[in-house]
Amino acid sequence: MQEQYTPSEIEAKVQQHWQDTKTFEVTEDENKEKFYCLSMFPYPSGRLHMGHVRNYTIGDVVSRYQRLQGKNVLQPIGWDSFGLPAENAAIKNNTAPAPWTYENIDYMKNQLKMLGFGYDWSREIATCTPEYYRWEQWFFTKLYEKGLVYKKTSSVNWCPNDETVLANEQVIDGCCWRCDTTVEQKEIPQWFIKITEYAEELLNDIDTLEEWPEQVKTMQRNWIGRSEGIEMTFQVAGSDQSFDIYTTRPDTVMGVTYVAIAAGHPLAEQAAINNPALVEFIEECKNADTTEAAMAAMEKKGVATGLNAIHPITGKEVPIWVGNFVLMNYGTGAVMSVPAHDQRDYEFAKKYGLNIEAVIKPVDGEVDISEEAYTEKGVLFNSAEFDGLDFQAAFDAIDAKLTAEGKGKRQVNFRLRDWGVSRQRYWGAPIPMVTLADGTVMPTPEDQLPVILPEDVVMDGIQSPIKSDKEWAKTTINGQEAFRETDTFDTFMESSWYYARYCSPHADEMLDPAKANYWLPVDQYIGGIEHACMHLLYFRFFHKLLRDTGLVNSNEPAKRLLTQGMVLADAYYYNNEKGARVWVAPSDVTVQETDDKGRTVKAVDSEGHELVYTGMSKMSKSKNNGIDPQEMVDKYGADTVRLFMMFAAPPELTLEWQESSVEGAHRFIKRLWKTAHDHIANGTTAELDVKSLNAAQKELRRELHKTIAKVGDDIERRQMFNTAIASIMELMNRLQKAPSETDQDKALMQEALNAVIRLLYPIIPHTCFVLWNELGNQGAIEEVLWPEVDESALVEDSKLIIVQVNGKLRAKITVAADASKEEVEAAGMAEEGVVKHTEDKTVRKVIYVPGKLLNIVAN
């Protein structure tokens, strides 16, 4: 065995072996327990970042561990390869998105192989290929036939100068990223999938996800947002018009003093006909940012319509206002306003001088609304026949009254909206719908699928090539002229079912049900918590759609979910002559002074700029603080990078990148290598005879088997990989100090190293692959099983007993593990420190905690 640890040489050799033997290619085997481990597939942006490396290292550790459990393990990989970044890069580099994407895939594929991830590359998919999106298009037509797809107008970001739709990220401070024109909101027809039809099931089935993080489940419950309330009808005074309002607080209905409607509400448009101020306000609302964060932060404004609504219970008239905080596409586009019991309504009423009438008070006191709204539930007053009722009693009574009079009904609502899947972009899967010359809209016939996206295009940076090319849209259906849909799918469509396609990636059908039902559901899914409410919800929804189409037989796509934390690194900047921040890469920074806790006080870059240190923040291009995985692998080897990633922090917490810690991981592997080298150089190893071991050898073997048990539990049940590694490191420290003179010393070291190498194999597989054979074991390490715990080794021959007199420590004694209470008591009483503190006293009681403590009570 070579003395020096040379990762580049070792890793290249081992990776070539895996490739030549197709080690990680798997097929269905009914005689083996399956395990499907999946990490969220990457977008091929050009290079892997450390966030990818962390995600995929966790997945690989889990996969390799399960393989050593004797399971049939599937760990596939692919590329989430449609999306806007490819269009932007194509425009910038004067190319088309396709070649840019495929070049990135090739480069990143080599990076993944360089890191030693055990993927079944025979199942590789790229979502931008017709072989993949063909079946997505087919499935969409089936959903349309089932009535789960529809088209309606919806608001988009519109650049009037370029006459094109903009994605949210292309709107910078309300202006077009390209020409700086003020962006407008425009209503255009778009396709939707009825996820709301599954809202109740998606919500209820969260309770079955026992091995998903509570945080993700809570976020999904809130996103789905089930509420129970009453939908009530308000008449418009002086007309036969009416409109509906939904509220979850019907107990406050007697305190309604005005009604607020959305700028897009029919009543708002009607009232604006002779009201220039309202016209201007409606335009302002239409062009406002309607994201939740923006809505929460913006100033609440309104304009009176001049119309009044008739209260459905009291018959009083209340004014109707247009408010910028009401959205047409949420609820009914109208809200009842009770300023005494809603803080937003309170502030709005104060601002515009509207009435505030309290109708709820605490059970045991008076209500004070002089400074703010009283928003708690309490008892009703100033509410006519409902006075004195609590929330639930008032809810029921008001519901009964409105229902009897035909003015309202109890209703369950969801915050969740139907999934808009239309994107006015080029680089996506074409939506397989056509419009005939007579205006009939229909799905593309199956024999015309896939609708192929042309890849040889010129990007002008303004309009999608399939929108500007009028010929592409033309087609013929049953001899009739027809026009293809020129919108493409939201890229969440591709990522919602890729996990299932891996089960039969080359099938001439969407899924091979037999293969899908062998592998699914995914046993372990790994990805960032930022995907909790979008991808992970669509992922669950799509699985139910696949189930209801007869393609899978399970209810949920993944049994267990691990959400890994972000990777952080130091961030530094200086202000240039224009006052703008220039972020400097950590590799270009020299730290000149630190405080007593090691924190940076003074730092400069290579050009002498004095830098501001902002602390640790997420690795990103914007802060120029990313660390290139390639550089780290070239410098230390893939196994070192993997070990650091798994050891530096628990997987769900943020990981702070410290190169000094990477160096520490590298030293540990070199120490392991040296320990194995020295053991092999020490000569032939005899058979281990556990019956002839001395006390020190038994203790070392006990530590070995305790470590095996702990590491297995840490990896499988607790998923605390960092503590598993810490246990192995502690054991290695003991092994390095262990004697190696006798045959049984050497035999015990052989057993220990064989076990340690298998424990570490999922984490540092290249090193362990080589060491396994160097230690004289036959065959590849992938073909062996996880070390078994020898329960007999855990049995201790002796126990250390703490001896106290009146609760104070007076001695420590070692007794046989099976010693009786009487024997322990006799040994304890004979100790000098015990004799000294009991000789002039009467022993009143002796308390013995078996194997731990002897307490003598004397006075």
From Swiss-Prot:
UniProt keyword terms in alphabetical order: Aminoacyl-tRNA synthetase, ATP-binding, Cytoplasm, Ligase, Nucleotide-binding, Protein biosynthesis
Residue positions binding ATP: 621
Residue window of motif 'HIGH' region: 42-52
Keyword field contains ATP-binding: yes
Catalysed reactions, as listed in the record: tRNA(Leu) + L-leucine + ATP = L-leucyl-tRNA(Leu) + AMP + diphosphate
GO terms (BP aspect): leucyl-tRNA aminoacylation
Keyword set includes Ligase: yes
GO CC field: cytosol
Short sequence motif 'KMSKS' region: positions: 618-622
Matches recorded under InterPro entries: aa-tRNA-synth_I_CS (IPR001412), aa-tRNA-synth_Ia (IPR002300), Leu-tRNA-ligase (IPR002302), Leu_tRNA-synth_edit (IPR025709), M/V/L/I-tRNA-synth_anticd-bd (IPR013155), Methionyl/Leucyl_tRNA_Synth (IPR015413), Rossmann-like_a/b/a_fold (IPR014729), tRNAsynth_Ia_anticodon-bd (IPR009080)
Subcellular location per the Swiss-Prot or TrEMBL entry: Cytoplasm
Entry's EC annotation: 6.1.1.4
Superkingdom of the source species: Bacteria
HAMAP family on file: Leu_tRNA_synth_B (MF_00049_B)
Family per similarity comment: Belongs to the class-I aminoacyl-tRNA synthetase family.
Protein's UniProt name: Leucine--tRNA ligase
Organism field: Shewanella pealeana (strain ATCC 700345 / ANG-SQ1)
